[in-house]
Structure formats: structure tokens, C-alpha cells
Amino acid sequence: MSVLKEYRTVSEVVGPLMIVDQVAGVHYNELVDITLHNGARRKGQVLEVQGDKAMVQLFEGSTGINLAKTKVRFTGHPLELAVSEDMVGRIFDGMGQPIDGGPELIPEKYLDIDGQAINPVARDYPDEFIQTGISAIDHLNTLVRGQKLPVFSGSGLPHNELAAQIARQATVLNSDDNFAVVFAAMGITFEEAEFFMNDLRETGAIDRSVLFINLANDPAIERIATPRIALTTAEYLAYEKGMHVLVIMTDMTNYCEALREVSAARREVPGRRGYPGYLYTNLSTLYERAGRLIGKKGSVTQIPILTMPEDDITHPIPDLTGYITEGQIILSQELYKNGFRPPINVLPSLSRLKDKGSGEGKTRQDHAATMNQLFAAYAQGKQAKELAVVLGESALSETDKLYVAFTNRFEEEYINQGFYTNRSIEESLDLGWELLSILPRTELKRIKDDMLDRYLPKADTTMTKVFVAND
């Protein structure tokens, strides 16, 4: 066994970064043990090596470091996470240390938090439905096992409540396989952390969940490690324990801000909006860890959540995320102001794999047809409401008024289900048919006659109310 060298050659500390001179045999991503002059211990990771100089990123900050008296020891291995099946039901900090007062874990193995690149040939195609209990997702933007489907939110929108709802309700139908949720919260406040912990505990969802919490006052470097630690846990549970794992990561905007902070400390040339030029590559190292592997029973599905700065979908974070992932769920300020929860704007939302996880044998044979018809009817109803605002209700035809009635009920009953209503896919489909019955059968052009005969209820014209927007 080789003896690890100890260095006392720290030459500079800038923000979360430390420069160590006269090093030898040091490698990128190597874990570093740091001992301060008062005996306190901290950890870091090698970020860059040039000649005999190593740049180390500090996980616990640089406060109190004395250049002359600080001891640095390079461990010879990357940052690793101690993993165990007993992690399910536990709460950890952003570096994977238990914070729930429970017993210390007995590690089954240690895994590199950066994971291993997945050979594309080894990937299995995502094609199994995951039920979230939310109609706007399950019916209209179906989530498939092994998919990565982000949520694009805005400032002040209830994405935390939506994340907690998905964590509580998500399940794989028609399967006896174990299902687990790995929840990574990055840069959140104490209040938000309390909300997530209490919600999962009170509803019993903590029993199948692993929760990692990085607070806003924790170091930026820890924020960069948190999603990797969460994904390493998910991969272990999926590929070695055969579990279907849903990874929820919020807020990816805080993660990207931490990347920008470290990049600025390294004096790198900034890219768009000051973010590092490698932001796309860095995000891909997280998102591409979702998927299924041929010959492996488990799977990793991702729902990354991000807040769009200034509600700008062209901002680098949502823009680059959209290039890597397979769709997006977009939350609406307008729906939120009107009291609809969750405020999912279904028209610009998209799941690129929704057709792979729907249909007979997965959900129901009428899934795709009703989805397309609901989209078309809602879009036409929105246009009719806008026309009524400009020209008045009298300018609408009788059919247009029915579309307005459909649109209002669609938002009030279908989208506005609340954060504690868990709808099965059958309930979502049946509700969709009930709303479509408002419209004349001749308008339902995207559904075949045999399905209309089987599923379409007879419209009760006395119950149909027409609402025209006045704003």
C-alpha cells in the first residue's frame, strides 16, 4: 500500500478554490483531505492540474484557512458515496451524510458519484407508463419509465408543491416491482426543507424515498455534488437492487448558479449570461444518467425542476435543458393567478415519449385519441375566448360558445385538481370524455366512431354553462 503524501504548500485561496503547489501524481476529480491549523477537517476535490500546481474546490468553504499551516492530503481516489439499500426512508444532507437522527448506515459498497458512461447500445427503450396522479401529465404529457422530463417553472409558482405531489403519488402500474423516489433539493431555504420533510413524513411517502437536502447557505461546491450523489444512489437502487427509481431534482437553476460562481472564481471566460461555456456538457452529465439498461430490471427516470429567470424560456438554463431532455412541463403564471392548482399550461408542454407509454396494455386504448382531441378542443376554445374579448360574445357562433364552455370546464375541473388529489389514469380518461361530451359529436374529428360509440357519454345540455372571459 502506497503512503499518501501530505502537503503544506497552499499558495492561494480564492472563494471556494484553493491552489496547492509542488504536488506530484495528483489526478483530476481526486478527493482531498484538508486539516486546518486548529485541527478542523474539511474535504475538497481536484478541479484542475497544471504542472506541479493543483486547483482544489472546497466543499465546506474557505473561511479560517491559514495558508502556511494548512495540511493537504490527496487520497488517490475520487469522491465516493457509501451506498446501501437502507438509504430508503432516510434524509441526508447535500453530501450524503444522514441528518434525520437515525443510525449510521453500514455501506454495502462505495461508488464514484460521477457514475459510469452508459453505452448507447446497452440502453433499452423507455416504454412503460409511470402514473403521477396528475391528469395534465398522465393523460396529456405522459411520463415513461426511463425518461427525463423537466418542469419549467417561474418565480413564485408552486413547483415545490408539485414536486412533493409527484413524490407522494408516482407509481408504476401493473407491476409488483419495487418503486422508489430519490429527491434532491438544491439551494432551498429552511422553510422549503421543512415543507418537503414534513410532507413526505406525514403522508408516509418517506418510507419509499431518499431525500437529499442542500440548503441555500451551504457551499456552492456542495450544491454541484448533490445531484450527482442523488443519481448515484438512484443508479445503485435501480441497477443493483432492481428498483424503479424516480429522481426529482429541484431547483436546477440553483445548481447552474453554483456552476457560474465556481467558474467566476476560476476566472474562466464566461459564456451566455455569464454561465460557463461548458454548461450544456455539464447538464448532460446529469440528465443522461436517466434510462433503462438491457438485461437490468430497474430503471432511472428523472424529473428535473427549474425556475426560469424572468420567466424567459430562452434563458440558457431552460434552453439547454430542453435540448438534452425529452420534453417539458411548463407552469403558467396566468393559471396560477386564476387559482388553478397545479397551474400546468398543457398547450406548450410536451412529452416526446408519450406515445411510447400509452395505449392498450399500458394505459387504455382511447388514450392517444382523447389526448389529441382535448389538445385541439382546448386550443380552439382559447382562440374563441380571445375573439370574444376583442369582438364581444355576440361575435361567437353557437359552436364557438360550446368551445368556450369546454375550455372553462377543462381548466376548472381537469387542470385544477389540487395538490392532494390522486387521479388514476382511468379517472383522467373518463373526465376527458365527460368534458368532450360538451361538444357536438361532429366536432370530435380526431376520434374514431367505434371509440365514440363506446366511451362518449350523452351530453346533458341542461348542465352545460357558457362562460365568456371578460378580461
Curated annotation (Swiss-Prot):
InterPro entries: ATP-synt_VA_C, ATPase_a/bsu_AS, ATPase_F1/V1/A1_a/bsu_N, ATPase_F1/V1/A1_a/bsu_nucl-bd, P-loop_NTPase, V-ATPase_su_B/beta
Biological process (GO), any one: proton motive force-driven plasma membrane ATP synthesis
Entries under Gene3D superfamilies matching the protein: 3.40.50.12240
CDD domains: ATP-synt_V_A-type_beta_C (cd18112), ATP-synt_V_A-type_beta_N (cd18118), V_A-ATPase_B (cd01135)
Keyword Transport: yes
Keywords: ATP synthesis, Hydrogen ion transport, Ion transport, Transport
One Pfam family from the record: ATP-synt_ab_N
Keyword rRNA-binding: no
Top-level taxon of the source organism: Bacteria
Molecular-function annotations in GO: ATP binding; proton-transporting ATP synthase activity, rotational mechanism
Function per UniProt: Produces ATP from ADP in the presence of a proton gradient across the membrane. The V-type beta chain is a regulatory subunit.
Family: Belongs to the ATPase alpha/beta chains family.
PANTHER family, alphabetized: V-TYPE PROTON ATPASE SUBUNIT B
HAMAP family per the UniProt record, alphabetical: ATP_synth_B_arch
Protein name, UniProt field: V-type ATP synthase beta chain
Source organism (scientific name): Streptococcus pyogenes serotype M18 (strain MGAS8232)
UniProt gene name: atpB
